[in-house]
Amino acid sequence: FMQKVLIYMNKLIDFYFDFISPYSYLAHKKILNINERKNFNYKAILLGGLHNLGNITAPAFNERKMKNMREDCNLIAKKNDVSFKWNEKFPINSLYLMRGYLFIDANKKDKFFDTCFDAYWKENVDISKEENIKEILSNCKIDQKSFITGIKNEKIKNELKNLTNLAFEKNIFGAPTFIVNNKLFWGQDRLEYALDEFKS
């Protein structure tokens, strides 16, 4: 029995995300609402890079899918009482912020994560613009000079590339994706299934 408890305590749900994914934002808000953040290991990937690897056309580049996605996200947000506003600057290049998430200190990651997501999917901010990135850094008390140097560091560049490649190798094709016990759950509507597996 004791061994099972220890295994349960050490196990986390891997959550693959990109700040440009509205469904990742909605999934994260659900996680906060049910106070489960401690059980998730957030893994940054570059969604555009993942789509290129898998030769996938994102919904953002298909007019009908895009229209459906906007309506779908609004429905999910309303149903779950989540503050959400479709960003007029969708999609953007999230490369610098995704690298930034990997670069910053562990104790600043949660604040940075929440601030980026809220800026883009709640406050309609274009988080690819330099002045808006600077404001995010200021709100998170992150040094701008070290951040700008950090995101150009080869180690950080390669880390994001490797995480994205690894996600592709694990058959991940979109965000959010949850992996627990080597089982893959794709989409914010599969969050409950991932949690069930985690607690089984």
Where are these predicted regions, by residue range?
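Short, Lys/Arg-enriched N-terminal segments with co-localized hydrophobic residues
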Residues: 1-8
